[in-house]
Amino acid sequence: LVIVFVVLLGVPLISANEEELLAILQDQRNDARGGCLNRYKSNICGTLVTPMNCITPRTRMGKFARKFCQFMCGIC
């Protein structure tokens, strides 16, 4: 009886989680930037690292900008 109870509760939880994951995946596929993610959007890319850093690839800030702020540099 306990096993049946656990299975009956577990199946809807897994299904709801799967639907949520599919929705997230679909949002990423429909992203206009082609999957280019901004991992540092609130604190680094755009405030500390500027688009001017994208044109200086030999500096440390330029290397960081081209690697992690690709949306800002137009690489995506």
Curated annotation (Swiss-Prot):
Residues 17-33 form a propeptide. Keywords: Nematocyst, Secreted, Signal, Toxin. Residues 1-16 form the signal peptide. Disulfide bonds: none annotated. It is found in: Secreted; Nematocyst. One of its GO terms (molecular function) is toxin activity. It comes from the Eukaryota. GO terms for cellular component: extracellular region; nematocyst. Belongs to the sea anemone 8 toxin family. This is U-actitoxin-Avd8c.
